[in-house]
């Protein structure tokens, strides 16, 4: 049956309401639909109108995977695979095997990837296939990053920034640099957060968050505001009384932050979620989930280890945790899936050849454009009808 002739505006309006993952499958239906993926105006319209899809990504042995959506089956059927390889490819690479990803930082549908030993940086949109390589000015093995955007502009589209954090003297002296997409350049940032920040950053609504400490019993959240380029101190919904308490941050949906906590002397694990995130430091939290585990979560890390413990909450409120567990005289990556009915199951990955490189995070696909060194052109399209 032939499709009726539809106006360009009507087709665009329909497609702007299709989730990004589904729209990706329709991309090559016709040239006009494919062109929308490179249209900055359409990507903004799509971001405002399309339903969101919340995916769990895991970084395992320098490759990105997506978590299986059949978590109910995983909880009750031992024959279902835990992982399926993430389908997107870095289209600008000739040989993906040469690109070993050691860190990932999702933000606004984009993923900042750092290669093994921090030799290269690339920003990637898995839905559109767009990439942008970021030239490094300084590089150290201990570098970690934060990825966000400037909220002060009327449109944050393409106004992205990367913060480089380098621990020059262990636990005492840090160096900060910031890269702006608009200027295509790095500059030294003269800031001092007056604390030690832990682990990987988490991006929510354009800003980045870490656990931070001044003493080993005084913990809080440190936020980096990419608009003002300053650090801010935010409270936790609980007290950490022991450095060995298990803890992790994660994005919840697109606009909330979640935090996991398990005290050193108990099997009870709590997850809290912010009621909202705004520019103030006056936050409120709600307890989202409590479960009592048979065993404690291991937390065998140094302060700046890049992947100690991570977790993700899916759309059905199942919780997936990942951490490196000491087992049989070595460390193996363990995944713990907890259902909303508090039934849980453990999986061990095949043995990882590098400790601390398994990491889980929340990812929301989008069609957002990556600004290249030059401006992205927004072409004026002629009025025409779409038909099959």
Swiss-Prot record:
Cross-referenced InterPro entries: F-box-assoc_dom_typ1 (IPR006527), F-box-assoc_interact_dom (IPR017451), F-box-like_dom_sf (IPR036047), F-box_dom (IPR001810), Gal_Oxase/kelch_b-propeller (IPR011043), SCF_F-box_component (IPR050796)
Domain named F-box is located at 1-46
Instruction: Report the transmembrane regions from the record.
Output: none
**Can you say what this protein is called?**
Putative F-box protein At3g17490
Native species of this protein?
Answer: Arabidopsis thaliana
């Amino acid at each position: 049956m032939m499709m009726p002739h539809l106006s360009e505006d009507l087709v665009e309006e329909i497609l702007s309401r299709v989730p990004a993952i589904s729209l990706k499958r329709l991309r090559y239906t016709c040239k006009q639909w494919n062109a929308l993926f490179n249209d900055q105006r359409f990507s903004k319209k799509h971001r405002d109108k399309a339903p969101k899809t919340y995916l769990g990504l895991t970084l395992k042995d320098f490759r990105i995977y997506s978590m299986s959506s059949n978590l109910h089956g995983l909880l009750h059927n031992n024959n279902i695979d835990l992982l399926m390889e993430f389908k997107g490819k870095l289209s600008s690479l000739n040989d993906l095997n040469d690109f070993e990803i050691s860190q990932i930082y999702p933000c606004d549908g984009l993923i900042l990837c750092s290669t093994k030993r921090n030799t290269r940086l690339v920003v990637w949109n898995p839905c559109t296939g767009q990439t942008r390589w970021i030239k490094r000015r300084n590089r150290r093995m201990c570098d970690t990053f934060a990825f966000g955007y400037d909220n002060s502009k009327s449109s944050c589209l393409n106004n992205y920034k990367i913060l480089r954090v380098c621990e020059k003297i262990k636990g005492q002296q840090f160096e900060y640099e910031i890269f702006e997409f608009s200027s295509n350049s790095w500059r030294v940032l003269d800031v001092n957060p007056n604390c030690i920040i832990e682990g990987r950053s988490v991006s929510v609504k354009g800003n980045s968050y870490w656990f931070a400490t001044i003493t080993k019993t005084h913990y809080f959240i440190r936020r980096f505001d990419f608009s003002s380029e300053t650090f801010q101190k935010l409270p936790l919904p609980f007290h950490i009384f022991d450095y060995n308490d298990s803890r992790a941050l994660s994005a919840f949906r697109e606009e909330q932050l979640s935090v996991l906590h398990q005290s050193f002397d108990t099997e009870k694990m709590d997850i809290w979620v912010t009621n909202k995130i705004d520019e103030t430091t006056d936050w409120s939290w709600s307890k989202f989930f409590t479960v009592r585990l048979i065993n404690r979560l291991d937390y065998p890390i140094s302060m700046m280890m890049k992947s100690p413990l991570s977790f993700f909450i899916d759309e059905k409120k199942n919780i997936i945790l990942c951490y490196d567990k000491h087992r049989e005289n070595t460390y193996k990556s363990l995944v713990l899936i907890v259902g909303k009915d508090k039934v849980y199951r453990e999986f061990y990955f095949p043995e990882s050849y590098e400790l601390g490189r398994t990491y889980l995070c929340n990812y929301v696909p989008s069609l957002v454009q990556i600004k290249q060194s030059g401006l992205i052109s927004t072409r004026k399209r002629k009025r025409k009808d779409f038909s099959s």
